[in-house]
């Protein structure tokens, strides 16, 4: 938990989970070599910003302005649950909003802010920070390709234990995911579609929730 990690170092003014973003940003900027990364090249700077954003395990879309340095950082979570749009006016100014209508008439060009991306004013342009090997089918195919008959035979023998392990992994991952979302500082509920998935999520939420889960 980010708040607990920095509790003795930063004085949090609110109970909002959004405030932890400031802690992560300050830690990133406190690195003695961060300013030099801007001049060392895009790869080093990108890696450091990506490292910070990877620590945010949840739903988010934010624009952080650093008044001391006159720079900003905009980012959106990997799934893109919260809407976010970015636009540019004729003078090259960057505008960002959670509703498209806020940018209409203000920009020469606007577009959705891509999920899993960030925009840092010192290195303009949307850049992907969230990357996984399963993004590409070819990469996964190569990773799990059966090389020979012996390996295939071994896998058949181990199929049942592996299946049981996979079921447990899915169970544990689902519970951990739902439990993590229950850390929200605002009221939450479950939208029931009548299917199995929403029912399972509701059951897990009820198991770990300290308050009544609304539907």
Predicted regions and their residues:
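Cysteine-centered catalytic environments shared across enzyme families
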Residues: 1-215
